[in-house]
Amino acid sequence: MGKAAAPRALPENEAKAVARMLRVSPQKLNLVAQLIRGKKVATALADLQFSQKRIAVEVKKCLESAIANAENNHDLDVDDLVVKEAYVGKALVLKRFHARARGRGARILKPFSNLTIVVREVRAEAA
């Protein structure tokens, strides 16, 4: 009914990457997103490398994409990057049927999620 919201423009010192339709529930994905939020990218990559969560591989790919976007598209220094935002959104939910005893049936819900990672260049000020 109203105006469509304009896409948020990123500042010059930020870059982002989005992974859509990840086959995991938003709740499980958010556990891994919280793991990297606010950390330097080198530390975040190391944490994801040794995480036991299955979805950590996909989160690592998305973070590497954000780092590459920062380096190639925005000319930012990789050593000064920090994960500013890592947030999760719901995508669609596939509904499946599972036959049960006595002629009954049950619904199986297979959720998908979206992941957005924003990295920011934070320069250390010389005193």
From Swiss-Prot:
This protein binds specifically to 23S rRNA; its binding is stimulated by other ribosomal proteins, e.g. L4, L17, and L20. It is important during the early stages of 50S assembly. It makes multiple contacts with different domains of the 23S rRNA in the assembled 50S subunit and ribosome. The gene is rplV. Belongs to the universal ribosomal protein uL22 family. Gene3D superfamilies: Ribosomal protein L22/L17. This is Large ribosomal subunit protein uL22. Keywords: Ribonucleoprotein, Ribosomal protein, RNA-binding, rRNA-binding. InterPro entries: Ribosomal_uL22, Ribosomal_uL22_bac/chlpt-type, Ribosomal_uL22_bac/org-type, Ribosomal_uL22_CS, Ribosomal_uL22_sf. It holds the Pfam family Ribosomal_L22. Part of the 50S ribosomal subunit. One of its GO terms (biological process) is translation. One of its GO terms (molecular function) is rRNA binding. It comes from Methylobacterium nodulans (strain LMG 21967 / CNCM I-2342 / ORS 2060). It comes from the Bacteria. One of its GO terms (cellular component) is cytosolic large ribosomal subunit. Disulfide bonds: none annotated. The keyword Amino-acid biosynthesis does not apply. PANTHER family: CHLOROPLAST 50S RIBOSOMAL PROTEIN L22-RELATED, LARGE RIBOSOMAL SUBUNIT PROTEIN UL22M.
